Amino acid sequence: MQLWVGLGNPGPQYALHRHNVGFMALDTIAEVHNFGPVQKKFQGWLQEGRIGTEKVLLLKPATFMNESGRSVGEAMRFYKLGMDALVVFHDELDLAPFKVKVKQGGGTAGHNGLRSIDKHLGPDFLRVRLGIGHPGHKDRVTGHVLGNFAKSEQDDLVDMLGAIASEAALLAKGDNVLFMNNIALRQQTAG
């Protein structure tokens, strides 16, 4: 069993923020793979389903970004999962918009959701980095991250989320390189 976590902030006012692209990824995966109903558990929203042959739990912490680790830690302990079962989908400033990269472990790069998970569980988990691009100057980062995707970006956003969901079985079985390559190919074809 695997636990896939999408990072974001709860509430409709945050739903379309770049910072919530992790939530968006999980919502798309749940829809494409016909996951079960949403349950309120572990200080978040949990859905159960299968991706390929793997049982996968999707968790969106409802704790706000800075406390995501509380929710994730609670779920990991309840299901007695090792760190190799944890996959975290998050927005990444230092990646071009709509690029997808998988990375094992590492630092938090100033991301408060990753910092919280690191604090509660340690750094050794798989990250699916979802590029939102950098606004160019550090003074504009907060407004960029907490801003909505522009109308002109919607097609690229939908293409990225759809590609992630379509290729999710590769991620579930640990074929991270093919997962990334196939997403990039789908995006080139869509563009």
Swiss-Prot record:
SUPFAM superfamilies: Peptidyl-tRNA hydrolase-like. The active site is at 19 (proton acceptor). It catalyses: an N-acyl-L-alpha-aminoacyl-tRNA + H2O = an N-acyl-L-amino acid + a tRNA + H(+). Its main location: cytoplasm. The record marks 91 as: Stabilizes the basic form of H active site to accept a proton. TRNA binds at residues 14, 64, 66, 112. Keywords: Cytoplasm, Hydrolase, RNA-binding, tRNA-binding. Its EC number is 3.1.1.29. It is found in: Cytoplasm. GO terms for biological process: protein quality control for misfolded or incompletely synthesized proteins; rescue of stalled ribosome. The keyword NADP does not apply. The record marks 9 as: Discriminates between blocked and unblocked aminoacyl-tRNA. One of its GO terms (cellular component) is cytoplasm. GO terms for molecular function: peptidyl-tRNA hydrolase activity; tRNA binding. It comes from the Bacteria. The keyword Cytoplasm applies. Belongs to the PTH family. Monomer. Hydrolyzes ribosome-free peptidyl-tRNAs (with 1 or more amino acids incorporated), which drop off the ribosome during protein synthesis, or as a result of ribosome stalling. This is Peptidyl-tRNA hydrolase.
